[in-house]
């Protein structure tokens, strides 16, 4: 799964087709050492499984959407995953959440927090667990938004606590750098005494409350990179 490989083949006789928009996003993610969320679909669903992408409707509920992969409008991708098993041939279903590293490194504001809340509402309504591949730079910081982003982060955090206290399950896979709000969400979802879910950290993942750039700009003591913090 790592290293450089190459093959020798006959030169092509036709023009090389340019990459489409989706392929460009996959390549951009790989250049950063990340996996584009839609590439996780086959792995998460498993052999014979299925994934239905979900997005918000006008009323704020998650509903199935039919669109090409990569056309998400927020930094969080939602879906419904079903995987058949020998014990459950009809399939085991769960609600899927994936942070999009190509949208401000998964920074969260109202669009992302609203999807977290809607996903937990859907999972509670259907009695399903949540699988969350977490990758996020924390609350969005920009010139056109302010503390309302933190208000939405707190609202999503409250919903996570209510969801787990009601006996429901969130399983978190830390799939990269998690900064600020996301580690708080991860902890509240999996680390309290009443929670049922697990927290899995991949080798190249990290959970930090403040990122390297923020510490540098504020005059604080940081490290060589976010993993060092």
Regions found by a protein language model. Give the residues of each.
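Structural signal for hydrophobic packing residues in well-ordered secondary-structure cores
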Residues: 23, 30, 45-51, 55-58, ...
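A structural preference for short, pocket-lining loop segments at secondary-structure junctions
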Residues: 83-100, 114-144
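Intrinsically disordered, low-complexity segments enriched in small/flexible residues
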Residues: 1-94, 98-104
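Glycine-rich anion/phosphate-binding loops
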Residues: 72-77, 104-121
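A short linear-motif detector with a strong N-terminal bias
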Residues: 57-61, 72-76, 110-111, 149-152, ...
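Conserved catalytic cores of soluble enzyme domains
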Residues: 134-229
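Short charge-dense sequence patches
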Residues: 61-73, 105-108, 197-213
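Flexible beta-alpha connector loops of hexameric P-loop NTPases
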Residues: 102-111, 143-149
């Amino acid at each position: 799964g790592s290293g450089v490989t190459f093959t020798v083949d006959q030169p092509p006789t036709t023009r090389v087709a340019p990459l489409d928009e989706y392929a460009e996003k996959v390549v951009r993610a790989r250049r950063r050492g990340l996996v584009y969320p839609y590439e996780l679909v086959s792995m998460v669903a498993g052999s014979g499984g299925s994934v239905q992408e979900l997005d918000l409707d006008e009323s704020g509920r998650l509903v199935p959407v039919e669109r090409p992969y990569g056309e998400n409008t927020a930094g969080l991708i939602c879906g419904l995953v079903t995987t058949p098993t020998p014990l459950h041939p009809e399939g085991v279903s769960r609600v899927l959440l994936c942070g999009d590293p190509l949208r401000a490194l998964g920074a969260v504001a109202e669009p992302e927090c609203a999807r977290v809340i809607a996903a937990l509402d859907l999972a509670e309504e259907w009695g399903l667990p949540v699988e969350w591949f977490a990758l996020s730079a924390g609350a969005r910081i920009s010139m056109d938004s302010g503390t309302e982003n933190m208000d939405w982060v707190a609202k999503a955090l409250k919903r996570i606590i209510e969801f787990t206290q009601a006996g429901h399950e969130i399983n978190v896979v830390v799939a990269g750098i998690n900064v600020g709000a996301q580690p708080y969400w991860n902890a509240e979802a999996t680390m309290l005494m009443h929670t049922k879910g697990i927290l899995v950290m991949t080798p190249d993942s990290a959970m930090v409350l403040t990122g390297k750039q923020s510490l540098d700009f504020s005059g604080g003591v940081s490290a060589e990179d976010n993993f060092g913090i």
